[in-house]
Amino acid sequence: MIRLIFLDIDKTLIPGYEPDPAKPIIEELKDMGFEIIFNSSKTRAEQEYYRKELEVETPFISENGSAIFIPKGYFPFDVKGKEVGNYIVIELGIRVEKIREELKKLENIYGLKYYGNSTKEEIEKFTGMPPELVPLAMEREYSETIFEWSRDGWEEVLVEGGFKVTMGSRFYTVHGNSDKGKAAKILLDFYKRLGQIESYAVGDSYNDFPMFEVVDKAFIVGSLKHKKAQNVSSIIDVLEVIK
């Protein structure tokens, strides 16, 4: 039996930005035999940082399901995708350049602030992110984050233009027609080729809902409600349930 767990990072695995609190959680999941899949709105660069710090070497999903990064040779069969460094990448979203092209048309009308038109200092202020992590968050490939706006209505304009606007733990994300569930389903199908699987997901926000729909058991940290997810106060509670 292959046991998989899809983990959101922000406010689910890690309360802030420091990886140390997550280390014992990851170790316990490894001891239970889990394949740990990060499924986050964070960029590839950010996730590579946390993967290194937490010693996680499995595939991962970036920017709200926009891309799946599979280490070369991870599966004992060919995976079709784009070769990028040491990964095979399955792209499900659209490039950030296209998103920013649209945001540029709207930023003055609606007072939008996002990564592409903000300084490092502004981003640090908006997010509370440590200065050394800001450049990693700025390495966006498939999405943009809306930090603030002065007028409502921009969401409707973007949706009418074919983009998706998704609420995360703190900010809205603009991306293509991708979500965490579609990406997770693709990985689940790969793992099913290896044998019987048992799948879990843990998240805390609306953008995690599609991920909950494709797994056997889901958990939501906090008070949001989802028909398929069990509410827990923290990821520590999840460990007790899935032992």
From Swiss-Prot:
Record: active site: D8 (nucleophile)
List of residues binding Mg(2+): D8, D10, S169, D204
GO biological process: mannosylglycerate biosynthetic process
InterPro entries (alphabetical): HAD-like_sf (IPR036412), HAD-SF-IIB-MPGP (IPR006381), HAD-SF_hydro_IIB (IPR006379), HAD_sf (IPR023214), MPG_Pase (IPR012815), MPG_Pase_thermophiles (IPR033980)
SUPFAM superfamilies documented for this protein: HAD-like
Pathway, per record: Carbohydrate biosynthesis; 2-(alpha-D-mannosyl)-D-glycerate biosynthesis; 2-(alpha-D-mannosyl)-D-glycerate from GDP-alpha-D-mannose (MPG route): step 2/2
Subcellular location: Cytoplasm
Cofactors: Mg(2+)
Transferase among keywords: no
Keywords assigned by UniProt, alphabetized: Cytoplasm, Hydrolase, Magnesium, Metal-binding
CDD domains: HAD_Pase
Reaction catalyzed: 2-O-(alpha-D-mannosyl)-3-phosphoglycerate + H2O = (2R)-2-O-(alpha-D-mannosyl)-glycerate + phosphate
Pfam hit, one: Hydrolase_3
CC per GO annotation: cytosol
GO molecular function: magnesium ion binding; mannosyl-3-phosphoglycerate phosphatase activity
EC numbers on record: 3.1.3.70
Main location: cytoplasm
The family this protein is said to belong to: Belongs to the HAD-like hydrolase superfamily. MPGP family.
Function: Hydrolyzes mannosyl-3-phosphoglycerate (MPG) to form the osmolyte mannosylglycerate (MG). The enzyme is absolutely specific for MPG.
Protein name: Mannosyl-3-phosphoglycerate phosphatase
